[in-house]
């Protein structure tokens, strides 16, 4: 058994960062470091790792061409063993959630596990639904944080999750618009390839606007300081979404740097959420 291969296939850096993001989300949701922070880290890390493994399992034919050095196509891990490894990691992550955290958090963990499996197996190839799935998984990290306080906690962080989902979906769509030539060459069925770059940009703007509106709902929770800070961040996000409006092809979309601006806006909003949760 190649231990290094089994470690690398979970994308350890990616999984650890996701686990730390889970702790950060719980701080934003509760205003302090919860007693269950270690379990949150373990749950997010193992389920993220499982998602990475199952993704490699279903992508093994593509990776044999594009990423032949990865553990499965290189022969370091047998596909069947990778499948069992993914199942084991999913069971560990969900087992920890069931045993050591509130039921709502365990429910989210199980739901996310199902979505990760469905995404790897076929949703990633489904126009828009795949984008929605990825965006939800990113936003659900805040639902994890809120779920520490039960159902009421989930409700309290819903605007944060909604704002993250909206902006993340906008960025996913814009990235697909940037990647149209490569996706077309590989036979992908992305939203921009099916419905055109203009429809994609308009949908991204609508999604980003929805995210911005959701972020404003938190004014009642954190007050005027938060509102002033988030309006500045929201302006960056809307600027990023609008900046690509004149693009007629992928090259112009890349030059507009919309996805990079949206990414900067997302990181800035995360900082505002964190400071508001801790200080206000």
UniProtKB/Swiss-Prot annotation:
Transmembrane segments annotated in the record for this chain: 4-24, 27-47, 83-103, 104-124, 128-148, 150-170, 199-219, 222-242, 260-280
EC annotation from Swiss-Prot or TrEMBL: 2.5.1.42
Keywords of the record: Cell membrane, Lipid biosynthesis, Lipid metabolism, Magnesium, Membrane, Phospholipid biosynthesis, Phospholipid metabolism, Transferase, Transmembrane, Transmembrane helix
NCBIfam families registered for this protein in UniProt: PRK12882.1
Topological category with respect to the lipid bilayer: Multi-pass membrane protein
Name under which the protein is recorded: Digeranylgeranylglyceryl phosphate synthase
CC annotations in GO: plasma membrane
Pathway(s) it belongs to: Membrane lipid metabolism; glycerophospholipid metabolism
Keyword Acetylation attributed: no
Superkingdom assignment: Archaea
Pfam family, one: UbiA
InterPro entries (UniProt xref): DGGGP_synth, Prenyltransferase_related, UbiA_prenyltransferase, UbiA_sf
Record Gene3D superfamilies: UbiA prenyltransferase
Nucleotide-binding recorded as keyword: no
